[in-house]
């Protein structure tokens, strides 16, 4: 039994981290682009900003369980199946991408207005402004955002597990409910809570470590 619990725990960790990584790889650049094309920013483009903003808002407004069903054909096309841990990563990462993009854009909006002028006065290029000034200044907030995304996806992964995605959610359903072993549900819940608490603590510690403000 404990071997099954260990496997389910590994699956949840795998799903959560892989989904977060994909969401960050797409969401952070989109969030940066959204911010940079905003009003009075260095790449201001009202049309592009409007399109990106609209896509992000639409993506964030769709409930995960509905998005999970909508993306079944996409998941089947990419992975070859809609069941299993790898298949669960597709809807989870797509669900989190607009969330990460919004967190990134908001983090950059918190940067003091005078930073751009100071960077330009030092002769920095637009790319240097983004990399050495904006991202450096916003890094603690971005780390907090990634941590929030990870712990959110842990909960969503349990939801995906009830639809055949594997992990602790699937364990709780298959053993706790169907096989009438309620203690398994409690074990799965405790493991999820511990994973979230540890992830949050590590994220908070890292954010404080890189915060030199």
From Swiss-Prot:
Per UniProt, residues of the ABC transmembrane type-1 domain are 9-202
Topology in the lipid bilayer: Multi-pass membrane protein
Matching entries from Pfam families are given as: BPD_transp_1
Any one biological process term the GO annotation gives:
D-methionine transmembrane transport
Instruction: Give any Gene Ontology cellular component.
Output: plasma membrane
CDD domains documented for this protein? TM_PBP2
Protein origin, superkingdom: Bacteria
**TM stretches of this protein:** 13-33, 50-72, 89-109, 139-159, 183-203
Is Protease one of the keywords? no
- Provide the alphabetized UniProt keywords: Cell inner membrane, Cell membrane, Membrane, Transmembrane, Transmembrane helix, Transport
Protein localization: Cell inner membrane
Quote the function comment for this protein: Part of the binding-protein-dependent transport system for D-methionine. Probably responsible for the translocation of the substrate across the membrane.
The entry assigns this protein to a family as follows:
Belongs to the binding-protein-dependent transport system permease family. CysTW subfamily.
Q: What is this protein called?
A: Probable D-methionine transport system permease protein MetI
């Amino acid at each position: 039994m404990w071997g099954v619990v260990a496997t389910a725990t590994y699956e949840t960790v795998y799903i959560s981290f892989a989904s977060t990584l994909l969401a960050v790889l797409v969401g952070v650049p989109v969030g940066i682009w959204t911010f940079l094309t905003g009003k009075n920013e260095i790449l201001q483009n009202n049309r592009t900003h409007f399109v990106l903003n609209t896509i992000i808002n639409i993506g964030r407004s769709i409930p995960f369980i509905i998005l999970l069903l909508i993306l079944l054909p996409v998941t089947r096309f990419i992975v070859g199946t809609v069941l299993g841990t790898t298949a669960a990563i597709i809807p989870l990462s797509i669900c989190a991408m607009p969330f990460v993009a919004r967190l990134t854009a908001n983090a950059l909006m918190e940067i003091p207005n005078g930073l751009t002028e100071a960077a330009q006065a030092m002769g920095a290029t637009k790319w240097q402004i983004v990399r050495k000034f904006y991202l450096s200044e916003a890094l603690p907030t971005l780390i907090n955002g990634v941590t929030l995304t990870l712990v959110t996806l842990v909960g969503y992964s349990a939801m995906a597990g009830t639809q055949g995605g594997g992990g602790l959610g699937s364990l709780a359903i298959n053993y706790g409910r169907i096989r009438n072993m309620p203690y398994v549900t409690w074990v799965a819940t405790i493991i999820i809570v511990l994973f979230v608490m540890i992830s949050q603590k590590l994220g908070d510690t890292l954010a404080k470590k890189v915060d030199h403000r």
